[in-house]
Amino acid sequence: MAMQLTDATFEVEVLQSELPVIVDFGAAWCGPCNAIAPFMDQLSEEYAGKAKVFKADIDECKALAMKFRIMNVPTILYFKGGQVVDKHVGMGTKQVFEDKLKKLI
């Protein structure tokens, strides 16, 4: 299951991670965010030990949402070496998200 990220845990969990990281920015009230949540949970389980997958609620992680200029949800950011290396905005299939992740492993 994808772990919940907070403003306080972001630096350690994402920026300092030696593994590639997906951060799924969404909100509880967002239908498309809820629709892709199972995909993120599946990727978290399938790539355990190879990548990390986090969820960040924009209503709770306002500083992060502002820092990365999250204007629409869902927005998925892909990090490697503490840097954003790819981005996806809107709905997508599990395959779309997985293909982007595979490029980072």
Where are these regions (language model features)?
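Conserved Rossmann-like nucleotide-binding pocket used by diverse enzymes
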Residues: 1, 6, 26, 54
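A short beta-strand-turn-helix
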Residues: 3-21
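Short pre-active-site segment immediately N-terminal to redox-active cysteine/selenocysteine motifs
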Residues: 18-19, 25-29, 72
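Conserved helix-turn-beta segment immediately C-terminal to the redox Cys motif
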Residues: 18-20, 37-56
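Conserved redox-active cysteine motifs that mediate thiol-disulfide chemistry
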Residues: 25-39
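Structural microenvironment flanking redox-active thiols in thiol-disulfide oxidoreductases
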Residues: 58-64
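Structural alpha/beta surface segment adjacent to cysteine/selenocysteine redox centers
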Residues: 64-73, 77-79, 91
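Non-catalytic, surface beta->alpha helical segment in thiol-disulfide oxidoreductase systems
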Residues: 78-105
